[in-house]
Amino acid sequence: MENVRIDNGQSFDFGKTASEYAKYRDIYPKELYDRLSALGIGKANSVWLDLGTGTGAIPRGLADHGANIIGVDISSEQIEQAKNLSEEYKNITYMVCPVEKLKFADNFFDTITACQCFWYFNPKIVVDKIRQMIKPNGLFLKLYMSYLKDDPIAKESHSLVKEFNPNWVGGSPAVQDLKTHYFDNPIMDSFTIDLPFTRESWHGRIKACRGVLASMDTKTFERFEEAHIKILQQLPEQFTIKHKVFLTYYIITK
């Protein structure tokens, strides 16, 4: 994938990170799921579409509530991982499709979510598509969760990625997306939380980011990995990383 608005047009492919995503990126905290549930996301017998679902972490986190869930992603590798991880959930269906090419009936979904991904889409197409697919007074929610660079461990890892991949702009597209509203009457919420990691799981989390396996060539990645492991060897086996979670949601009237 290439996007002139992201990483100075540098190509990236989350399919290359699918196994790391499956193993290391399902780190969303219970507090997030509690907030999503309080908004009615995942409620029994509702119909919920998760855009850019990746390995399906968010749908799995609320699948027991009884919604009928469809997760879509452009990456076949990510969807393969999602299916493997979701075998026990008969109420989740996954499909490979660019969001811009989705075809569902009008007024089909009670809820549409876009977690860690809305800035990758073409809003000129996707905004109208959301309006078409969602039911009157349906809920559309965008989610962004990131480590905070004032956390010393996160700062060092982030700086190392930038050293090996100068085109990577980190979460800048997401920050801009937080300020951009395509629907009326946005409701915004956020909270900070310390998430637990081991040296292995933090290394895996960083490998899965857009700036590492998704876009580095093999030799660059090998040099990055060697340098990152050296940093991690100076840390205790277990530690926490400060994160911030941003929620923006809209009731879509028609």
Feature-to-residue mapping (PLM):
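Class I SAM-dependent methyltransferase SAM/SAH-binding core
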Residues: 47-49, 55-101
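Conserved Class I S-adenosyl-L-methionine
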Residues: 124, 180-254
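A short beta-strand submotif of the Rossmann-like class I SAM-dependent methyltransferase core
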Residues: 114-115, 123
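Conserved class I S-adenosyl-L-methionine
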Residues: 1-43
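Conserved catalytic/acceptor-binding region of the Class I
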Residues: 131, 135-195
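A short acidic, Gly/Pro-enriched loop at the edge of an enzyme's catalytic core
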Residues: 100-111
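A short, conserved alpha-helix within the catalytic core of class I
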Residues: 120-130
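Short helix-loop-beta connector
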Residues: 41-47, 105
